[in-house]
Amino acid sequence: MNILLANPRGFCAGVDRAISIVESALEKFGAPIYVRHEVVHNRYVVNKLKEAGAVFVEELDEVPDDSIVIFSAHGVSKAVREMAKSRALKVFDATCPLVTKVHMEVHRASRKGSEAVLIGHAGHPEVIGTMGQYENREGGMYLVETPEDVAKLKVKNPDDLCFVTQTTLSVDETSDVIDALRAHFPKIQGPRKDDICYATQNRQDAVREMAGLVDAMLVVGSRNSSNSNRLRELAEKVGAKAYLIDDASMIEADWLAGVEAIGVTAGASAPEVLVQSVITRLRELGGKVVAEHPGREENVVFEVPPELRIL
């Protein structure tokens, strides 16, 4: 059984930055450091940060006064920011800059009074944070996930309408929803550049290119990771059996029956150490040749806040 590794895979610049912010805050200020929501959606990463002294909470009322709090890579609503400010909490913002870009687009629409449509998954922290950027009561902010949602959508003024997207969606499915929006609301305006982030796009492209070369695909990532779920769905869509796994312990030998080539990729919040443990386990189960499939090189870097830069 050959093992083919997708490229690029694993950590993106936004995840690297978010983890570095938590690690640097712990190094500079000591534990505990409070983090609102999982800083990235990966169980291994969160557990390692917990061991180092990070305390993960879902709401700010769980954070004691005079504490340091970090906002997760998924971003937060304006209301959360205002609450942190009113309590004089020291905040470090680990929101991915590409999510912040979407927040600014929604903020501009709110300020102008334009209505806005967000393409995204209800309940996802990024979606909650993005919806929470819109404050204009005279306008409106709407969430859609499918072309069927678009068909049922009613807005106040279809002539003054824009759309944005969650950054971690399926490129193909998002394109279908955008097409539906443009058909239903011919004057709708979109962002100058697609909101789906470069890392999401690149990892999906790598899976699409590789899926025809393998019989099965393992996606390393946690179940609450949106981009990891989209990778598994895409692999299945293009014809490979696909499994989403947190780590090597979840691999079942039955999955490999009759498999001559297996692909391995990792979501943007999954560290390379987990990929290497998967390779080790696959070797134990009969894997032989390990090859890196060529892919797009990534050199994007997002800096941590100046106060947290360790010299």
UniProtKB/Swiss-Prot annotation:
Give the binding site residues for (2E)-4-hydroxy-3-methylbut-2-enyl diphosphate: H41, H74, H124, T167, S225, S226, N227, S269
Quote the record's binding site residues for isopentenyl diphosphate: H41, H74, H124, S225, S226, N227, S269
Which Cys-Cys disulfides exist here?
none
Return the InterPro entries for the record.
LytB/IspH
- GO molecular function ontology, one term from the record: 4-hydroxy-3-methylbut-2-enyl diphosphate reductase activity
Reaction catalysed by this chain? isopentenyl diphosphate + 2 oxidized [2Fe-2S]-[ferredoxin] + H2O = (2E)-4-hydroxy-3-methylbut-2-enyl diphosphate + 2 reduced [2Fe-2S]-[ferredoxin] + 2 H(+); dimethylallyl diphosphate + 2 oxidized [2Fe-2S]-[ferredoxin] + H2O = (2E)-4-hydroxy-3-methylbut-2-enyl diphosphate + 2 reduced [2Fe-2S]-[ferredoxin] + 2 H(+)
Which residues make up the binding site for [4Fe-4S] cluster?
C12, C96, C197
Task: Quote the protein name from its UniProt record.
Answer: 4-hydroxy-3-methylbut-2-enyl diphosphate reductase
- Organism of origin: Aeromonas hydrophila subsp. hydrophila (strain ATCC 7966 / DSM 30187 / BCRC 13018 / CCUG 14551 / JCM 1027 / KCTC 2358 / NCIMB 9240 / NCTC 8049)
- Gene symbol? ispH
